[in-house]
Each structure stands twice: as structure tokens, then as C-alpha cells.
């Protein structure tokens, strides 16, 4: 589990900042420049309000829709998830990389155009 070191208040709640850093390479299919960033701090954010704009701990603005904070379970019922927001990877905010903790297994996911695309992965 991430060690919570401090937090930042946002309109959607507290963002807990971890001292851990992340190095991540993102292959972009839309011919946008590849993204590689070191020493990216990430935090814990529990999304509760739809269509809010909040300023993240790294100064980026992110558009959030309430529906995207849920995943469907085996019975196709929505299940609330808690997101570990990592970074916004483009100025337009089209790509948001984050981690989702579910049943002690961390999944790396991408948020793009209002859809969640799931990929296997682990917290660094």
C-alpha cells in the first residue's frame, strides 16, 4: 500500500501524495510524441462529483465524469473504485494514466475520451 505523506485539498476531495516515484513509457497510437517522465509523484483521489474540474497536485487540470469512476462487476453492476492518479500525459488532457486498486491486485488503466481501457500492470 502506498505510504501517505501529505495531501492536497481539491474540489473532489483530498489527493494523498506519495514519496514513491514512477517511471512510465506510453506508446501512443495517434502519432503523438511518446511520453517518458521520471520522478512523477502520484496520489490517491476518490472521485465523487460529476463534471468537475479539479487542479491536480502537479498543476494539471483534469475533466472527470462520474460514470468513469465505476467499473462493472461480474453481474454488470457498477462498482465504485478508488483511483491512484499518476499524471496527465498531454496538454489537452486526452490521456490520463492512473492505477486502480481492486482486491489487492493493482491494475494499470488508461482514461481516454471517457472510456476506461484496462491493462494488466502493477504498482511500481
Question: Which functions belong to the PLM regions below?
Answer:
Residues 1-124:
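Ribonuclease/tRNase effector modules and their secretory precursors
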Amino acid at each position: 500500500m502506498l505510504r501517505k505523506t501529505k495531501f492536497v485539498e481539491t474540489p473532489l476531495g483530498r489527493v494523498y501524495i506519495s514519496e514513491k516515484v514512477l517511471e512510465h513509457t506510453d506508446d501512443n497510437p495517434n502519432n503523438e510524441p511518446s511520453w517518458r517522465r521520471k520522478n512523477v509523484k502520484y496520489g490517491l483521489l476518490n472521485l465523487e462529483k460529476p463534471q468537475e474540474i479539479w487542479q491536480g497536485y502537479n498543476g494539471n487540470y483534469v475533466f472527470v465524469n462520474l460514470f468513469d469512476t465505476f467499473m462493472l462487476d461480474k453481474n454488470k453492476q457498477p462498482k465504485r473504485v478508488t483511483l491512484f492518479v499518476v499524471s496527465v500525459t498531454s496538454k489537452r488532457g486526452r490521456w490520463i494514466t492512473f492505477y486502480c486498486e481492486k482486491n489487492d491486485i493493482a491494475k494499470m488503466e488508461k482514461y481516454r475520451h471517457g472510456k476506461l481501457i484496462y491493462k494488466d500492470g502493477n504498482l511500481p
